[in-house]
A protein has these predicted regions:
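Flavin-dependent oxidoreductases
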Residues: 1-103, 112-123
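C-terminal catalytic lobe of FAD-dependent flavoproteins
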Residues: 57, 65, 74, 87-89, ...
């Protein structure tokens, strides 16, 4: 307890602790912390060539069929997977003491997604893996962000389960700010 804060609106954007933040006001949010993998490749010559020719970085790409996403990371790529064989992490609560420590990676578990990624982005198949990361994210049951006003709690808003922060964060922030100020998110946030 650090004192009282008076405000017109409250936004639960608690990330891994969104469940705990919700419980502070009596909410049990439908969220689950799951393991989530991504990898960083070594330098990819085709990317270096593209950067030098255009003076630009590669765009962020989501391949829904392949259940992967990529973005340029230095002179290589960050390649993330939306795993079919998901593993829950701390299913009931996230300890307040958790400091974003990484979890043990499992290359075998994500190899089906990686194979699709390599097929859809052939230069990545030849790239070495510089680092493999596995860390927890919160997910809603439908895989979409849990966003909007919370029924029964005036001016209490949810911006939770934004698991792909660099691809969804800006849109979630814009929709929520429109909703809070204008009364409408400005587009369908439930699709």
């Amino acid at each position: 307890e650090k004192g009282t804060i008076k405000t017109e609106h409250i936004v639960n954007a608690g990330g891994l602790w969104a469940r705990e933040v919700g419980r502070m006001v009596g909410l049990e949010l439908p969220l689950l912390a799951m393991e989530h993998h991504y990898l960083l490749t070594d330098e990819v010559p085709e990317i270096v060539e593209f950067n030098e020719k255009t003076g630009k970085e590669l765009i962020h790409v989501i391949d829904f069929k392949g259940e992967i996403y990529t973005r340029q990371e230095q002179k290589g790529v960050l390649l993330g997977t939306y795993e079919q064989a998901c593993e829950p992490w701390s299913p009931l609560e996230t300890p307040w003491s958790f400091g974003h420590e990484l979890l043990e990676p499992n290359l075998e578990r994500i190899s089906p997604s990686l194979e699709i990624g390599f097929k859809h982005f052939p230069p990545l198949e030849k790239a070495g893996i510089r680092r493999m990361i596995n860390g927890p994210f919160t997910f809603a049951p439908d895989g979409n962000p849990l966003i909007g006003p919370v029924p029964g709690l005036t001016n209490y808003w949810s911006a939770c389960a934004v698991m792909a922060g660099f691809s969804q964060g800006g849109g979630v922030g814009l929709a929520l700010s429109n909703w809070m100020i204008e009364g409408d998110p400005g587009h369908d946030v439930f699709g």
